Amino acid sequence: MAVRLEHPFSTEKPIDEVYAAILDLERLVPCVQGASVLEKTGPDSVKAQIDIKMGAMSMIFAGTVEIVEQDPEAYRMVMSVKSKEQGGSGYANAEVAFSLTDGGGTVNTNAQITGKAASMGEGVVHGVLDALINDFSGKLATL
């Protein structure tokens, strides 16, 4: 199942400060509700996991988060998320693009979900991901 989301956010922090914060995956990943960094694996990558609740189901996805593109002059960054459901056969993979402007920016997410999570239906999956990324976008302003 493919899910595409776009979330604008605003902040009063200087654009250089926000850009530096989004490049720090050990600060950025925990901004997603239920997510934590397990291990730093390189200058631009971490192993992470997230606990997600969809309806009556709780799932844990673990995998990698890696910055795959950086454009400091345009204040743009793209990260790749690849994860597998623990104890299941599902996957949750995403490309997350950050575009910053003075006063805020946009988070664009293109996700692919399979397994139990996808079986919950497009409406439920979209709603859960939308809420997670909306909350995450709000936390970007505080980094």
Predicted features and spans:
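A generic structural micro-feature
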Residues: M1, K40, G55-F61, G88-A92, ...
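Hydrophobic ligand-binding cavity/cleft-lining segments
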Residues: M1-S45, Q49
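Intrinsic-disorder/low-complexity, polar/charged segments enriched in Ser/Thr/Lys/Arg/Asp/Glu/Gln
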Residues: A2-P8, S45-K47, I60-A62, R76, ...
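Generic structural detector for well-ordered beta-strands
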Residues: P8-S10, E39, K53, E66, ...
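Glycine-rich portal/gate segments that line the openings of hydrophobic small-molecule binding cavities
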Residues: E39-S83
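Beta-strand/loop substructures that line and gate deep hydrophobic ligand-binding cavities in soluble
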Residues: E69, V78, K82-D130
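A contiguous pocket-lining binding segment that forms or flanks enzyme active sites
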Residues: D135
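Short, highly charged C-terminal tails/helix-capping segments
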Residues: G138-L143
